[in-house]
């Protein structure tokens, strides 16, 4: 018998405020990106998403809608569930993991986010409509598979 595949589950979110700005966090390794984090055992995707957003940014979200599911096929394999959401409440509060948290325009987000995986996630979310999308990618080197 072979080992069962093990995938890391990640929830990520493009959050917009009333001025239509996007919330970005700056991770100490990956640079600027959307708030995201691992889904812990026993958590629903929405609970994990809300928890990660609050931990990394100090804000709460509303109207979270699943828009894009990404499959990372390279080890460690991961499924990344990407949502669009609205800012609900709270003050921007950096964390140890994300020392910078800022609202910015779509254009500024495009300039700040340099990691190709994170850039493609933002583009997919910005281009999303009411249909759920599926994308897959590999790393080393980074390449989209569909």
What positions do the PLM features span?
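Short secondary-structure boundary/capping segments
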Residues: 5, 14, 24, 84, ...
């Amino acid at each position: 018998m072979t080992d069962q595949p093990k995938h890391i589950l990640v929830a990520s979110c493009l959050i917009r405020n009333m001025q239509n700005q996007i919330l970005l966090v700056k991770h100490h390794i990956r640079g600027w990106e959307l708030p995201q984090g691992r889904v812990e055992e026993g958590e629903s995707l929405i609970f994990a998403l809300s928890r990660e957003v609050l931990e990394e940014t100090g804000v709460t979200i509303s109207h979270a809608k699943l828009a894009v599911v990404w499959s990372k096929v390279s080890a460690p394999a991961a499924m990344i569930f990407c949502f669009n959401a609205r800012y609900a409440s709270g003050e921007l509060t950096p964390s140890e993991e994300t020392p910078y948290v800022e609202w910015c325009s779509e254009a500024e987000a495009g300039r700040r986010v340099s990691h190709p995986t994170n850039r493609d996630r933002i583009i997919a979310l910005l281009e999303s409509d009411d249909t759920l999308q599926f994308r897959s990618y590999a790393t080393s080197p980074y390449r989209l598979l569909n």
